[in-house]
Amino acid sequence: MEATRRSRLSLSRRRPPLGVRPRSNTAGSLPDGGECAKLWTELLRTASADLNVDGELPPLPAFPDQEPRRSPERPPPETFTVGTETFFWTPFPAPSPGRGGNSGGSDLVLSAVRGRTGSPQQYAAPELRGTPSAEEQPSEEQPSQRQSSVDGAMTLQSCPMCQVDFAPGLAQLDIDGHLAQCLADSTDDIEW
C-alpha cells in the first residue's frame, strides 16, 4: 500500500523556511531612503497627481478650431425576425445637424466642386470647338496615310499595314476594327 502511495505524485505548496519572512513592500513604501527610492517616490507622486479620485486621467485639451463634442448617443438596437431566428441590428447614427438631414455627403462634395447648385437649364452650354481641318494641318503624309476631313474628323483612306483602301462611307468604328485586326494578325513592328 505504501508503494502505491509513493507512485502517486501529489503537488503541495512549499512552506518557506522559518528564518526567512516574505517581503511586504507595497507600492507606496520603498525599502531604504536612498537616492533611488527618492526618485521613485517623486515619480509616483507626480504620476498620481494627474489622476482623479476615480483613477482616470484628466481629459485631453481640445485642438484649436475644435469644439468639444458630447459622446454620440447610440440608438437602441432594432430587432427583426427571419423565420424562427431573431436578429439584432444597431442602426447608423443620424447625421449631425450642420450637414443637413436629407442631403448626403456626395451631394455636398459635388456642389462644392461645381461651385454652384441648380439645374443645368439655368446655365449656358459650353462652346463647342471642332478639330482643325486638313488645310490647317501640315501635310507630310504618305499616300497610304492620306486623310480627308469628313464632318471635322480625320479618317484614314487606306490601311497602313495591308494597304487596303477603305470605302468612302466607312464608319470610324469599322476602320478601327480593321486596324485592330491587322495589328493582331501582324508580327511586324509598325512605326506610325
Curated annotation (Swiss-Prot):
GO cellular component: a single term: Fanconi anaemia nuclear complex
Biased composition (Basic residues): 1-16
Zinc finger (UBZ2-type) in chain: 156-192
Residues that bind Zn(2+): C159, C162, H178, C182
Biased composition range(s): Basic and acidic residues: 66-76
InterPro entries: FA_core_complex_assoc, FANCA_interact, UBZ2_FAAP20
Positions of modified residues (Phosphoserine): S119, S149
Biased composition (Low complexity): 132-149
GO molecular function, one term: K63-linked polyubiquitin modification-dependent protein binding
A GO biological-process term: DNA damage response
Region annotation (Disordered) ranges: 1-34, 51-151
Keywords on record: Chromosome, DNA damage, DNA repair, Metal-binding, Nucleus, Phosphoprotein, Zinc, Zinc-finger
Cellular location(s): Nucleus; Chromosome
Subunit and interaction comment: Component of the Fanconi anemia (FA) complex. Interacts with FANCA; interaction is direct. Interacts with REV1.
Purpose: Component of the Fanconi anemia (FA) complex required to recruit the FA complex to DNA interstrand cross-links (ICLs) and promote ICLs repair. Following DNA damage recognizes and binds 'Lys-63'-linked ubiquitin generated by RNF8 at ICLs and recruits other components of the FA complex. Promotes translesion synthesis via interaction with REV1.
Domain description: The UBZ2-type zinc finger binds both 'Lys-48'- and 'Lys-63'-linked polyubiquitin with preference for 'Lys-63'-linked polyubiquitin.
Protein name, as recorded: Fanconi anemia core complex-associated protein 20
Source organism of this protein record: Bos taurus
Name of the gene encoding the protein in the UniProt record: FAAP20
